[in-house]
Amino acid sequence: MKKIIIATNNNNKKNEIIDILSDIHFSCEILNINGLPDVDETGDTYKENAELKTNSVFEYIKKTNIKADAIIGDDSGLEIKELNNKPGVYTARYAFINGRGKHHSTTDNIKYIYDIIKSDKTEAKYICYIDILDIKNNIHIGSFGKLDGFIIKRNIKYNKNYFDYDPFFQLQDGRILSDISRKEKNKISHRYNAITSSLYIKG
């Protein structure tokens, strides 16, 4: 059984990846490691950021006795057509880099986006790039996934139970992403599509 490390300290993201791997019956053991390094997403692309994360964890475990077969890292973002596919790789800090909010504040990000988009409903998509560092073969295996929909203006208060932009993301069938079950989301999400497209996962 392959031993896998998920290169994130974000429990929501980690649990989503674990659930997806379980749902698709990918046989592996997830290694829970405390103190993984936090990585600054300095890349200009999803691919660069995802590889920064897997490389950082690889350098970290080389200093330990931890044995793993692969490291999974991802970078994801929201692309809004009206904004020429921004915020993209800057999704988590979009308001901050434009002087309009705190670092990694979804509340500030959505307020800023609402201020600069003209439409109450505008085409958007979630993008995810999965990088799997195959340690044995010393190669990076990457794959993209997306989820098409819309960003809609809603007068709701963001709370800790929400994940990313989900309460403001409308699926093409009209449902709000935060309203569907986690199990159902994991079968359609950008992260699911990226993971299931990976040649490493396909074997």
Segments from the language model and where they lie:
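Anionic-ligand binding patches
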Residues: K2-I5, N12-I20, I24-G203
